[in-house]
Amino acid sequence: PWGGGFIAGVGIGIVQNGACTAYYLPIKHQNGTNFDKRWVLNYVEEICRSQIPKVMHNCMYDMGWLKHEGIKVNGPVYDTQFAAAILDENRMSYSLNNLGKDWIGEGKDENILREAVKSFGLKDPKKDMWRLPPEYVGVYGEQDCITCYNLWKYMEPKLHEEKLWKVFQLEMDLVPLLLEMRGRGIKVNLDQAEKNKVKLKTRLKDLVTSIYSDYGSKVDVWSAESIRLAFDKQNLEYGRTPTGKPSFTKEFLDKHPHELPQRILKARRIEKTISTFYDGMILGHSHNGRIHTELHPLKSDEGGTVGGRFSCSHPNLQQATARDPELTPMVRGMFLPEEGCKWGALDYSSQEPTDYHQMVADMAGIDRKPAKTINLGITYGMGGVKLCHSLGLPTDWVVGKNGNTYEVPGDDGKNLLETYHSKVPFVRGLIDLTANNAQNRGWIRTAGGRLCHFDHWEPVRGYSPAVQGKKAAQEKFENKPIRRAFTHKALNRLIQGSAADMTKLAMREIWKEGIVPMHQMHDELDFSFESESDGNKCKEIMENCMKLEVPILVDAEYGNTWADAVHKW
């Protein structure tokens, strides 16, 4: 609705005696005959008001538009797109047409639609559908309803068989909350955003000018070739890509001791803040002083993650980093609570995993910083090379039997990892346990019952890109010994998936208390609180929604803006 769209027509399927009869009701097609909009919406409202079960595909979209028209959907709602993502989180597509073809052998014949689009001088069958007369679209819309119902008949027993109904119900229970969150939106300070943008543009111009005046180079901060010329002029060393081209990554610039790369990096950050956060997020996506961001609870063609954690779009507030001491307040400071309220940031304290870094550092006889890097890196499936990069340790290059060159950890990194694993063997034991379960069973289950599948395969010896499906892998690798791929990341999947379960359980319980979060980001829930008691209530729910042997703690901080939420009440 905030993008200027509208409902062109409604597809409805009525189920009697196990069979679905579908109808398409056009109300706002550009060409052809439409039905009276009020009559159609009254009819739809009558259906939605009843307690009979409803089946939809992408209910967030359908119910969102119905909500925009003032129509509330009562009774059980079952979403086939949600069900598909829970049954198989590794699919490439979750479109109704592709699921219908793959799982029940039902696909749509889109030739009529394509021919109609062509004959009317249009281009995109999906985007231009509303421009066509309803008779061309009706068959398409009616088949959607029938396929959706038949898919549900296939999926419902599978959810029970695989003990996933509880997970599915949790996701469905969150839909009304997510729609309410998006509908309310988040207040933004547009006047201050415009002023900050002007300041940053001046700051960027001055920074680029200072690079030229101090170092004699006009630098395009995003061009490796331009930066190379500036580095060569100052006799500064830099890395190269495997193909020999100059490389100036964020990590390289950040750790470089010279002032030139520091100014280049600062200019990049300022330019990104202007383009991504001000133009693309705060000013570019605001509607009547609010941003209506969209959360994706499960994997779909529009977003989402394989592990059940939320992703975000239109705009993606998860990009609003908290790490830059200068720029973070200029971005997060634009997000406001409701009038007379405080912004409440309730953050799980080391939700995944609990902070045990100093204990491990003492056990291994190493500093806390490398202990933390290794703890987090290894549990998330990071290899030795990436760990060396994270710790600033050197790596080596070796030539394999196939003649290819491979990067491996250097001696310092290998020695540190050997010390870590010899002194802290339980970490390797936990990694191996989850990896072996994934390898042997093909799946692991999170604390909330969510399944994480490992259905990609790779050769036991040598390296080749993994292939989805055992049969396809056997054909590709010509019956060489194969094994499941990516099982070294099983512990990461377990931790991330369980964290998603916990956050979603908390959100459902908070919603039952009549409290609506403004946003969910990583391990944090953000609220607009009238009183500290509401904050304490949400904190208690978050800490106790899932009982674990190790207590989960939540840090509650408050302020006048998102950036200012670092204080006690």
Residue ranges and their predicted role:
Residues 1-30, 74, 91-94, 101-104, ...:
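Conserved "right-hand" nucleotidyltransferase catalytic core of DNA-directed polymerases
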Residues 16-54:
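Nucleic-acid-processing active sites and adjacent nucleic-acid-binding tracks
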Residues 56, 77-78, 343-347:
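Short hydrophobic beta-strand that contains or immediately precedes a catalytic carboxylate
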Residues 60-71, 84-87, 228-235, 349-352, ...:
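Short active-site loop/helix that positions an aromatic residue
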Residues 72-89, 96-101, 353-357:
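Conserved beta-strand -> loop -> alpha-helix junction used to position metal-binding or nucleic-acid-contacting
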Residues 143-149, 488-508:
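Conserved pre-motif C helix in the palm subdomain of viral-like polymerases
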Residues 540-550:
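A common structural junction motif
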Residues 563-569:
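Short, low-order "capping/linker" segments at domain edges
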